[in-house]
Regions:
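Zn2+-dependent metallopeptidase catalytic core
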Residues: 2-19
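Active-site scaffold of zinc-dependent metalloenzymes
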Residues: 17-59, 69-76
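Catalytic Zn2+-binding segment of zinc metalloproteases
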Residues: 54-55, 69-87, 97-100
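Solvent-exposed alpha-helix faces
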Residues: 93-94
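Long, well-structured alpha-helical subdomains associated
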Residues: 99-120
Length: 120
């Protein structure tokens, strides 16, 4: 499978939101949020992988990034369960709204309701 590396300003915004630009760890953390290549997070390395063949709008890409980054930030394990997915979605909504990405947050909310309505 051919992969394409995406660059998004969102991932560095997240590092800034977590640490603040003046924190020396920001420079160390930036590479951890590198988008290496549809959407899974390698929690041990801190990488988010997105299939380069999947066509995503900017808001969809932000949604996937926020969801997968949430898995990393919440320290979810490889063998995730429905509760992990639900908490990653909820955390992604918070991250996106906090950064002013309202359209992307709405995508997560819509997907969240669709995905989790049976459990709510």
């Amino acid at each position: 499978m051919k992969t394409k590396t995406y660059f998004s300003e969102f991932r560095s915004d997240i590092a800034v939101a977590i640490l603040g630009k003046d924190d020396y760890r920001y420079e160390v953390m930036k590479p951890l949020f590198q988008i290496c290549g549809f959407g899974f997070a390698e929690t041990s390395s801190g990488c988010v992988f997105i299939d380069g063949e999947v066509k995503l709008t900017k808001d969809e890409l932000r949604w996937v990034e926020a969801h997968e980054l949430a898995h990393i930030m919440l320290k979810h394990k490889k063998d995730r369960n429905d509760n992990d997915e639900m908490s990653a979605d909820m955390f992604a909504i918070i991250l996106l709204k906090d950064k002013g990405y309202d359209k992307a947050a709405q995508l997560v909310e819509d997907k969240f309701l669709e995905r989790h309505k049976r459990k709510l």
